[in-house]
Amino acid sequence: MSRIVRFSVLVLLIALLGACVAPPTSPSATSMINPGDKIGDFLVTKGEAEDVVYTWEMGCTKQGSAEVYACKSTVGEKVNISAGVYAALSGKTLDSLWSEHTYELLIGDRPVNLAAFGSIDVAHPRVGTMRHWNVVLEAAKPGEITIHDRGKVDGEAFESTMIFTFSPP
């Protein structure tokens, strides 16, 4: 009988200890976005230059007088959502401009951990090599998401909002 009591006490202790384990955490609304994070039906990831569409290739349209743009894409298309830096006409090297620039990117209200994504160089048809943060959005199904960015390059401040609408292919 004492074996059954000891065994029952042991099982009860194990059950109580298991109940004390903290539940798995999910990203909070203010936590930084990292590669592989999902925001609703949108995957935030990195991409290869040749497999990604850049906002300057999309023909985004300005909405009114503010720096707000509407951008249209299709589900499954990989879209780099960051602003690019280029050296054409600046008299400086791209590396110099990149090291001096400041940039902040938010998806919805959440900041993006830019260092975790790294940068990517891409050939632009008019300005030559352009460097972007390698932040890529991919939609699993139709939807809309808002991106806000701001920064400073070569002493020039900028700020914009982009509303991306992903439609069925």
Q: Which residues fall in each region the model found?
A:
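C-terminal motif of bacterial Sec signal peptides marking the signal peptidase cleavage site
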Residues: L16-A19
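Short, solvent-exposed, Trp/other aromatic-anchored flexible loops in extracytoplasmic proteins
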Residues: H124-G143
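Short, well-structured beta-strand segments within conserved domains
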Residues: P142-G151
